[in-house]
């Protein structure tokens, strides 16, 4: 070690080319055995150059190697469009917006009057509906629309608006907590 210091005194610049006597810093010239071990060493040091083996080509895979026919494309497009329409219909109808939280009720306008969502006379319990009741919801909506059509065709058969308002206020009062107790 002292010999190395004597050959390179402090403060003297060394040449840019490495010296032959300091071969320990030149790891590319190190004898690692066969070529496989040398490649492994270079790869582990991060200096190995990866060679393209030709095995992997982008887009060439067994699952994607077949091409779709025009009929398959049409079928897939129709399925996607039907799914899109179903989701848009459910979003725009607001059917799933009704159950936004505990005690939440959304105001709907059927005949120009503000009705509270879920004010059917047959549903007297304040319990929230379960998601399994979606079929009965659509049936009750169909019945309501049929009743509205019948009322539009026969205006003389409908109830007077005053009794209808009284029935609504009585129904709403069933859920109002009394302040006397």
Swiss-Prot record:
Source superkingdom = Eukaryota
Where in the sequence is N6-acetyllysine found? 172, 177
Presence of keyword Phosphoprotein? yes
Per the record, where are the segments of Acidic residues compositional bias?
A: 106-146
Q: Where is the composition biased (Basic and acidic residues)?
A: 48-78, 147-169
Q: Which residues carry this modification: Phosphoserine?
A: 15, 17, 63, 87, 125, 145
Crosslink (Glycyl lysine isopeptide (Lys-Gly) (interchain with G-Cter in SUMO2)) position: 13, 62, 75
Query: Looking at the record, which segments are called Disordered?
Result: 1-181
In its keyword annotation, does this UniProt entry include Ubl conjugation?
A: yes
> What keywords does the record list, in alphabetical order?
Acetylation, Isopeptide bond, Phosphoprotein, Ubl conjugation
Q: Which family does it belong to?
A: Belongs to the SMAP family.
This protein is called what?
A: Small acidic protein
Species the sequence originates in: Mus musculus
Gene name on record?
Answer: Smap
């Amino acid at each position: 070690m002292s010999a190395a210091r004597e050959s390179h005194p402090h403060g003297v610049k060394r040449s840019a080319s490495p010296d032959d006597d300091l071969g320990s810093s030149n790891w590319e010239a190190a004898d690692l055995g066969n070529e496989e071990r040398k490649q492994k060493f270079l790869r582990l040091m991060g200096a190995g150059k990866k060679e393209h083996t030709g095995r992997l080509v982008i887009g060439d895979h067994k699952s994607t190697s077949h091409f779709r026919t025009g009929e398959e494309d049409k079928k897939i497009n129709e399925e996607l469009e039907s799914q899109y329409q179903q989701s848009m219909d459910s979003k725009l109808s607001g059917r799933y917006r009704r159950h936004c939280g505990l005690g939440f009720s959304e105001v709907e306008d059927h005949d120009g009057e503000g009705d509270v969502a879920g004010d059917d006379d047959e549903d007297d319990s304040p319990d929230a509906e379960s998601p399994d009741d979606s079929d009965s919801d659509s049936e009750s909506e169909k019945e309501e629309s049929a009743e509205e059509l019948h009322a539009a065709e026969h205006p003389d058969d409908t109830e007077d608006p005053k009794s209808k308002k009284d029935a609504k206020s009585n129904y709403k009062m069933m859920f109002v907590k009394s302040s006397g107790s």
